[in-house]
Amino acid sequence: SVTGKVHPKQFIANNTAQIGDVIILTKPLGIGILSTALKGGLLKNSHLNSMLEGMLTLNLKASRLAVKFKTSAMSDVTGFGLLGHLKEMLNPQISIRIFENSLPLLRGVRGYFDIGLIPAGAYQNYEFIKKSCPHLQENTLLFCSPETSGGLLIALDEKNANALLK
């Protein structure tokens, strides 16, 4: 958690997404998977560099753009993984459709995931999310994996999303 002051007009909650919003993910996923491979002594140097680059990329520019383009809701992808933080953005009127093939992954992540290098936290997150999403498939574990210095999930209307992405 963070304690600090924010200007009331720049505060963006994580649970105020609107029907019809587009959600943008600002950084690739997979730091949790790659760090598990590192702990197991299996991470290739090229993938280590990719992991470190991802962790060292700050969210400052993305957060400033989010304020500029009238974001409805925003969350950082950290310990609850992508799906856990998306769940925080839901309310009874909102559901989210995920286009799995369009989710960015750091280099090497899928290979390490496929051989079972999955952080324990991913299983805990999966069980928690499954309580409210009973049809969740186990192949979504990758998207339950905790992230360190993950990107932002920015929810905003389609017009502002297109402008932000330019």
Please give the residue ranges for each predicted region:
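Active-site glycine-rich loop that binds ribose-phosphate moieties when present
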Residues: 1-11, 46-66
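Residue-level recognition of alpha-helix initiation/capping sites
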Residues: 14, 56-57, 81, 159
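Short, hydrophobic/aliphatic alpha-helical segments
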Residues: 18, 57-71, 137-138
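Residues on a specific face of well-ordered alpha-helices
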Residues: 18-21, 27, 31, 49, ...
